[in-house]
């Protein structure tokens, strides 16, 4: 008698990731394996899960797996798309006991078992899962103050304009002011990166002095949340310290020059993204200035538009400008996240590829991060895709399909796309081998 897949305990399914991909390759003489768990960051009320009642939520799947891998004799490195502040609570009470979205549940598990040596600035194997080291990879929190927060504020003001259908100079000035902050930050990041790109004599062992980088330890240094108790100037300096620290690592801290060359080459994509972001921001500022000029010049005057007469700016035109600005600011929000996300991907790949002691890695991150990792690992480092939880294409064709696709995660997304937060890993090797 056949058993329904809903009740089959022999099917190994995981609630949370929309896909899981295993890749293997060789860097020099070191064999490396990486498992990429692709998350879709949905709120709890919109999450889905597997039909199988024996499927495990992803944090429980990891906990059980990490408990069992001791028998392999290997050391595993687990990377999570969280930042230092999210995985090191100051007091135990900060651990949230309510049910949250899948990646946050993994984050709560991470907090409870993360072990770190501040003197060596290195993650240690866990006391609970003795074969596993835990790493955070996300440092975008240090960009929030002058990129994401101003864009959010600009969108907040624009949302009010949209709801009221009313353009006011003071609101437009507020938006332009926030966007000027973003533009200045983009220019700062580009300036820092250009200082590395234009210097061909980078010294790995002396790069901190060479580029004015403070030797900070992220898990001990003043955190972003603590910095809000300081003046804006002090906050800004803390933020710049972090940005310089991580960019310096990405540009200079390598043992293998081939890896260094290939990843730095990929950084150009990120730089182009920041340039594009800055251009988008400045174009919106120009639009706002033009609208305000038109508002001033038409104020109190009789204006003809579409065969009608108005006092001041025509209402139809005002609505058109509101809709245009609304859409551009919404797009800016998504573009800023997308462009900056690529920097995180390079940061992870540098650690995974360049460290000989990292041989078996697991990454839990947003799907777009994983797609970028796949794109670079396959095209630049000749990694092979050996297992996929979900794909419309045969496994023996997927690696070549990635190689043939144009650069960019959007071009390989159809190979791995899945709408359900359920991944079948029944036929994957046991114990992340």
Curated annotation (Swiss-Prot):
Major subcellular site: virion
Name of this chain's protein: Uncharacterized protein R160
Native source species: Acanthamoeba polyphaga mimivirus (APMV)
Similarity-based family: Belongs to the mimivirus R160 family.
InterPro entries: DUF5847 (IPR043885)
Cellular component, GO, one term: virion component
Keywords: Virion
UniProt-listed Pfam families: DUF5847
Subcellular location per the Swiss-Prot or TrEMBL entry: Virion
């Amino acid at each position: 008698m056949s058993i329904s897949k809903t009740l089959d305990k022999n099917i190994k399914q995981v609630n949370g990731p929309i896909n899981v991909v295993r890749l293997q390759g060789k860097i020099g003489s070191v064999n490396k394996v990486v498992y990429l768990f692709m998350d879709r960051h949905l709120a709890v009320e919109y999450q889905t899960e597997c039909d199988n009642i024996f499927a495990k939520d992803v944090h429980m799947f990891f906990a059980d797996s990490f408990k069992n891998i001791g028998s392999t004799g290997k050391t595993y490195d687990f990377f999570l798309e969280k930042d230092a502040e999210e995985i090191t609570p100051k007091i135990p009470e900060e651990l949230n006991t309510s049910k949250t979205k899948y990646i946050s549940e993994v984050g709560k598990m991470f907090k409870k078992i993360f072990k770190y040596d501040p003197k060596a600035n290195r993650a240690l194997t866990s006391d609970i899962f003795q074969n596993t080291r835990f790493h955070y990879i996300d440092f975008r929190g240090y960009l929030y103050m002058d990129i994401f927060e101003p864009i959010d504020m600009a969108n907040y003001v624009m949302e009010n304009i949209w709801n009221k259908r009313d353009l006011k100079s003071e609101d437009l000035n507020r938006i332009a002011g926030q966007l000027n902050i973003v533009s200045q930050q983009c220019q700062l990041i580009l300036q820092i990166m250009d200082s590395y790109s234009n210097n061909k004599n980078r010294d790995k062992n002396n790069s901190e002095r060479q580029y004015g980088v403070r030797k900070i330890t992220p898990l001990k240094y003043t955190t972003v949340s603590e910095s809000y108790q300081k003046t804006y100037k002090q906050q800004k300096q803390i933020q710049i310290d972090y940005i310089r620290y991580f960019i310096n690592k990405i540009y200079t801290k390598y043992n293998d020059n081939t890896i260094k060359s290939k990843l730095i080459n990929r950084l150009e994509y990120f730089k182009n993204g920041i340039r594009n972001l800055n251009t988008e921001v400045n174009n919106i500022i120009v639009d706002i200035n033009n609208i305000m000029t038109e508002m001033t010049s038409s104020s109190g005057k009789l204006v003809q538009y579409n065969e009608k007469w108005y006092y001041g700016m025509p209402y139809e035109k005002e609505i058109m400008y509101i809709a245009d600005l609304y859409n551009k600011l919404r797009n800016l929000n998504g573009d800023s996240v997308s462009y900056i996300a690529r920097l995180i991907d390079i940061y992870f790949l540098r650690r995974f590829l360049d460290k000989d002691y990292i041989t078996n890695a697991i990454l839990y991150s947003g799907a777009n991060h994983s797609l970028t990792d796949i794109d670079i690992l396959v095209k630049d480092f000749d990694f092979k895709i050996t297992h996929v939880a979900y794909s419309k294409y045969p496994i023996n064709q997927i690696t070549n399909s990635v190689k043939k696709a144009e650069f960019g995660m959007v071009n390989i997304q159809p190979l791995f796309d899945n709408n359900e937060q359920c991944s079948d890993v029944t036929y994957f090797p046991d114990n992340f081998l």
